[in-house]
C-alpha cells in the first residue's frame, strides 16, 4: 500500500520565477518559505520536527524581528518531536503566528496555542482536539513502572504548557484533557487556545494594523 504523504510530496508543484539572471524554479514550499511561511502537515514525528526547527532557525537568522507564520493541519504525533518544535518556537526571537487549517489535534493543538499572543488563529471549519498523552511499553515490571512515572510527568508538563498559553486554571486543563475533547473553531477561541477565528486574509491584516 502506497504512503499517501510520499505520493503527495511527489506531486508538489514547482513555481518558476523570472530574475535578472534568468529563470529560477522553486518547489511551492520553498517559495512559501521565502515569504516566512512554514507548514506542519500530517503526523508530528522526528523528521518533520527536524525540518520545521531548521526552517524556524533559518528564518530567525535571516531576520530576527520579522514574524514567522506557522500553518498547521495535523492529527498530532510523537510528544518529544512536538516538544522540539515547541521549544524552538519559544527560543527564537521572531514572533511566530499560528493558523489551524483542517485540524490541530493532540500535539498539533499544543503547537497551535503556542503561537505569539494575539497571533493565534483558526479557520472557521477547522477542528481542534486536546487530550492527555498516551503510550505503551513492554518489558519487566520495574521498567514499565518507570515508564508510567515518566508519562505522568510528561502529562503534568503538557498541562502546565496549556495553562500558560490559554490562561485556564490547571484543574480545568486537567479535566478537559482527561479524554479526547473536540472543539469547533469558536469553542477553541472561547477556551483560549486561539485568539480569533478568521475567514478572510484581510482579517489577519487588520489584526496586524491594530
Curated annotation (Swiss-Prot):
Principal location class: cytoplasm
Alphabetical GO biological process terms: protein quality control for misfolded or incompletely synthesized proteins
GO molecular function: ATP-dependent peptidase activity; ATPase binding; serine-type endopeptidase activity
Record keyword Hydrolase present: yes
GO terms for cellular component: cytoplasm; endopeptidase Clp complex
Residues of the signal peptide: none
Subcellular location: Cytoplasm
Enzyme Commission number(s) from the entry: 3.4.21.92
Residues annotated as the enzyme's active site: 106 (nucleophile), 131
SUPFAM superfamilies: ClpP/crotonase (SSF52096)
Xref: PROSITE patterns: CLP_PROTEASE_HIS, CLP_PROTEASE_SER
UniProt-listed InterPro entries: ClpP (IPR001907), ClpP/crotonase-like_dom_sf (IPR029045), ClpP/TepA (IPR023562), ClpP_His_AS (IPR033135), ClpP_Ser_AS (IPR018215)
UniProt entry keywords in alphabetical sequence: Cytoplasm, Hydrolase, Protease, Serine protease
Pfam families hit by this protein: CLP_protease (PF00574)
Function: Cleaves peptides in various proteins in a process that requires ATP hydrolysis. Has a chymotrypsin-like activity. Plays a major role in the degradation of misfolded proteins.
Oligomeric and partner information: Fourteen ClpP subunits assemble into 2 heptameric rings which stack back to back to give a disk-like structure with a central cavity, resembling the structure of eukaryotic proteasomes.
Protein name, entry field: ATP-dependent Clp protease proteolytic subunit
Organism lineage: Bacteria, Pseudomonadati, Pseudomonadota, Alphaproteobacteria, Hyphomicrobiales
Gene field: clpP
Amino acid at each position: 500500500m502506497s504512503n499517501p504523504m510520499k505520493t503527495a510530496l511527489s506531486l508538489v508543484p514547482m513555481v518558476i520565477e523570472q530574475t535578472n539572471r534568468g529563470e529560477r524554479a522553486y518547489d511551492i514550499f520553498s517559495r512559501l518559505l521565502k515569504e516566512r511561511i512554514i507548514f506542519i502537515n500530517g503526523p508530528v514525528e522526528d523528521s518533520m520536527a527536524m525540518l520545521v526547527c531548521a526552517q524556524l532557525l533559518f528564518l530567525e537568522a535571516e531576520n530576527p524581528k520579522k514574524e514567522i507564520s506557522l500553518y498547521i493541519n495535523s492529527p498530532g504525533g510523537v510528544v518529544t518531536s512536538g516538544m522540539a518544535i515547541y521549544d524552538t518556537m519559544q527560543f527564537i526571537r521572531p514572533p511566530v503566528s499560528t493558523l489551524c487549517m483542517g485540524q490541530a489535534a493532540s500535539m498539533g493543538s499544543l503547537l497551535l496555542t503556542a503561537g505569539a499572543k494575539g497571533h493565534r488563529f483558526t479557520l472557521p471549519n477547522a477542528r481542534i482536539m486536546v487530550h492527555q498523552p498516551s503510550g505503551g511499553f513492554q518489558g519487566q515490571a520495574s521498567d514499565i513502572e518507570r515508564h508510567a512515572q515518566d508519562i505522568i510527568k510528561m502529562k503534568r508538563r503538557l498541562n502546565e504548557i496549556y495553562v500558560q498559553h490559554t490562561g485556564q486554571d490547571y484543574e480545568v486543563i486537567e479535566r478537559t484533557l482527561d479524554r479526547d475533547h473536540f472543539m469547533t473553531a469558536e469553542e477553541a477561541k472561547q477556551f483560549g487556545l486561539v485568539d480569533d477565528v478568521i475567514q478572510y486574509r484581510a482579517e489577519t491584516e487588520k489584526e496586524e494594523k491594530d
